[in-house]
């Protein structure tokens, strides 16, 4: 349980609130991959999901709790409404974690009470107290959120928080659910809580905010100045609607402006002690991983991690930066994991140089993964003169994200043009070693390839997302393809990278189908959940 008030606690909700971004659905393996990277990044708490929302969410939270929530690792958190069924599901899913937290919430604004909950203030007070106490029977660490706190009556909010803390809440989280407040208002709200909740010193004050007015990060910084010590944020700021407060922006604000923020933590301005536990050199890699797995591209002018964040086009700026970086840059690109000395590899580079560079970039791979990635590297080197760090990241990320190779693409060939019908031929090796060839006609080359693959694999599915991103500049750049298919309500994703977009598209599609086929082979394991568990629930905090 985290009780420190002398630093900022980073609570990452990429896997819960971030995944509620339209089109950002992740499967269990992808969530686990991100959770592992968040642990390396140094986040204090990972909100791994909403266990009662679906069987898939339950499985993901349980697996992350078991594999990432080890001794010395982050606290693993599960979201739950203030109902016994929700809290019971969260408690069961979190059981394997060394440090577990249940995060339970109920709305407190008058508009939510009247139209959503249809309950009185007295009823909400009773429910909050009772359900926090129930959550304490599963874990010692309980977080309580009054949903839509930003629009709640302050006096009622103080009462709810006092009751929740008295019932055992160790963290009270103040959400600006609809991104409505301004920094001055949000800072005042936190200050009011510090001054008017009698037992507030028994809990950590946390904040959660959305970016509907573009003020989430500014609101959080003001909240910290007024006593908040936990910040709920997401990588790249992904989340519902306009997103959440961006982890990388908050962390680097405390890193760059440490002298300004130190006094608010009772430190002398010149103190060099970091204000967070984040290893900032993992920020860029984490951003790229989340972008790749969710298929949500980072806008070029995004603060900290955007492609243009350290770019200078103005001649005056370029001249200044060349003479001294501090003239126009307030932080070192290396501090977030970007390197100035990009080592360029080529077809004459050997396995040792390849492996050494991967280690320098922070990748920890098994011998088998290195061998597979090296084969991809040599294949790429025959097509591309210079291979950059970004290319290497793409190769490795595509390799480590691959499922068991049940179906293997041996050949893909397409014919298309403005006066011909797109046609594709594929040769696929099946799980029993047989090579099958088929062809199909489509509305475009990718459609034709997918139809040909479907004829061989013969697993019913709906393609729900297809996205392509260029890794580097240039006509010979690698293209990363992310696709998602749906089968019986479940979503399966595939990723691939290649200088040939058609090949990458075929490999990504087959990757998703391999995941789907593997699940069909082993069957979906049944989980002991409450009988009335729904297929899907949308969280509101």
Curated annotation (Swiss-Prot):
Spans through the membrane: none
User: Pyruvate carboxyltransferase domain location, by residue?
Assistant: 8-284
The superkingdom of the source organism is: Bacteria
Q: Where located?
A: Cytoplasm
* Cofactor(s) this protein cannot do without: Mn(2+)
- Which residues does the record give as Mn(2+) binding sites? 17, 208, 210, 244
Q: Which CDD domains match?
A: DRE_TIM_IPMS
Give coiled-coil spans as residue ranges. none
Enzyme class at the top of the EC tree: transferase
Q: What is this protein called?
A: 2-isopropylmalate synthase
Q: Which gene encodes it?
A: leuA
């Amino acid at each position: 349980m985290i009780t420190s008030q002398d630093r900022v606690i980073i609570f990452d909700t990429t896997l819960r609130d971030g995944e509620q971004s339209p089109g950002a659905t992740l499967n269990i393996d992808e969530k686990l991959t991100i959770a592992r990277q968040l642990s390396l990044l140094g986040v204090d708490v990972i909100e791994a999901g909403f266990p009662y929302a679906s069987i898939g969410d339950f499985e993901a939270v349980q697996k992350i709790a078991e594999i990432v929530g080890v001794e010395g690792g982050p606290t693993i958190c599960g979201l739950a409404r203030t109902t016994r069924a929700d809290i019971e599901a969260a408690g069961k899913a979190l059981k394997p974690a060394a440090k577990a937290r249940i995060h339970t919430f109920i709305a407190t604004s008058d508009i939510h009470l009247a139209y959503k909950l249809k309950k009185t203030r007295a009823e909400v007070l009773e429910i909050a107290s009772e359900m926090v106490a129930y959550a304490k029977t599963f874990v010692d660490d309980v977080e309580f959120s009054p949903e839509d706190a930003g629009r709640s009556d302050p006096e009622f909010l103080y009462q709810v928080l006092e009751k929740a803390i008295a019932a055992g809440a160790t963290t009270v989280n103040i959400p600006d659910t609809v991104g409505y407040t301004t920094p001055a208002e949000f800072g005042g709200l936190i200050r009011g809580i510090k001054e008017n909740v009698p037992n507030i010193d028994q809990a950590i004050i946390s904040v959660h905010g959305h970016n509907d007015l573009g003020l989430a990060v500014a609101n959080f910084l003001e909240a910290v100045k007024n006593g908040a010590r936990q910040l709920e944020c997401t990588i790249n700021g992904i989340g519902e609607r306009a997103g959440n407060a961006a982890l990388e922006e908050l962390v680097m604000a405390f890193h760059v402006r440490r002298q300004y923020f130190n006094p608010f933590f009772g430190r002398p301005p010149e103190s060099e002690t970091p204000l967070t536990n984040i290893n900032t050199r993992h920020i860029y890699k984490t951003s790229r991983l989340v972008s790749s797995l969710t298929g949500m591209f980072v806008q070029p002018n995004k603060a900290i991690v955007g492609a243009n964040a350290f770019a200078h086009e103005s001649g005056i700026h370029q001249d200044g930066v060349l003479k001294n970086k501090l003239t126009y840059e307030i932080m070192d690109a290396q501090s977030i994991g970007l390197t100035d000395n990009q080592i360029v590899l080529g077809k004459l580079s050997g396995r040792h140089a390849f492996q050494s560079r991967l280690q320098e970039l922070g990748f920890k791979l098994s011998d088998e993964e290195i061998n597979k990635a090296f084969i991809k590297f040599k294949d790429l080197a025959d097509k591309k003169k210079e291979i950059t760090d970004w290319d290497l990241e793409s190769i490795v990320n595509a390799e480590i994200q691959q499922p068991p190779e049940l179906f293997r693409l041996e050949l893909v060939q397409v014919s298309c043009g403005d006066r011909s019908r797109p046609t594709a031929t594929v040769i696929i090796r099946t799980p029993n070693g047989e090579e099958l060839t088929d062809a199909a006609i489509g509305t475009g080359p990718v459609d034709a390839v997918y139809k040909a693959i479907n004829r061989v694999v013969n697993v019913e599915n709906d393609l729900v997302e297809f996205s392509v991103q260029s890794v580097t500049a240039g006509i010979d750049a690698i293209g990363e393809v992310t696709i998602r298919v749906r089968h019986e309500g479940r979503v399966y994703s595939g990723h691939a990278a290649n200088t040939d977009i058609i090949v990458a598209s075929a490999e990504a599609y087959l990757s998703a189908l391999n995941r789907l086929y593997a699940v069909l082979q082993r069957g979906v394991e049944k989980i002991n959940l409450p009988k009335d568990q729904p297929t899907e629930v949308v969280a509101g905090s």
